């Protein structure tokens, strides 16, 4: 029995990367600048554009059945949802985001305890309050509407809690990271009632499997070739494969067909070696998913 899954697509910085990930996983999501309701080529899905900061509360309520948001915002809102899986991707890289405690470069602060009685500015107010309360460090945490880094530079606060991937922008602005408070990646979350529904759970699990397989395929390619049977062992030693390469004997021949999956960046290094070992008909092909 089929049904309809209400799915939240994160609006903002994760939006384009999420749509592209779904495309690689097999779904075409089309977003219009005039609508908050993206089209999707799946009659069993209804998509809505929702800010990651609000995704957790809507999933918890059951307004939507499932969606993608940063784990940081799920924790910020203390959302009571099912975390189905995590997926490491962002608008610019494939690395986790970090929420860091930041001060000016010449600040005397070296650790969180040095901020006793200080004022901290951040978008992540709830988490930051809990972080310092758990360590019995009295601070005042203020919500920042933006330009958070400028506030500590201008002396409007003593420190900030800000999100970064590399820390390069923080350093470029004359600031210093005291420590990391939390690492965050996008997570697929589900409403508990939806997760208890057999059809919706299977649909959500299918989405999770295909999204993860699309991420797993990034930077990977397939390589196949024909080679003399007596060079098989030498060639398989050269090939960096997820598992052992697939080998098939060619009909009425002392040659074999070899197929392997490997990082794309390795191809330029190993192809000359394969040719020296007698490989012929080498074909490289892209991968959309590795399941």
Curated annotation (Swiss-Prot):
Keyword DNA-binding: no
Family classification: Belongs to the ATP phosphoribosyltransferase family. Long subfamily.
Regulation: Feedback inhibited by histidine.
Keywords: Amino-acid biosynthesis, ATP-binding, Cytoplasm, Glycosyltransferase, Histidine biosynthesis, Magnesium, Metal-binding, Nucleotide-binding, Transferase
Protein name as catalogued: ATP phosphoribosyltransferase 1
Subcellular location: Cytoplasm
Record flagged with keyword Transferase: yes
TM spans (from-to): none
Superkingdom, taxonomy of origin: Bacteria
Pfam family, one: HisG_C
CDD domains attached to this UniProt entry: PBP2_HisGL3
Cofactor (UniProt): Mg(2+)
GO MF annotations, alphabetized: ATP binding; ATP phosphoribosyltransferase activity; magnesium ion binding
Catalytic class of the enzyme: transferase
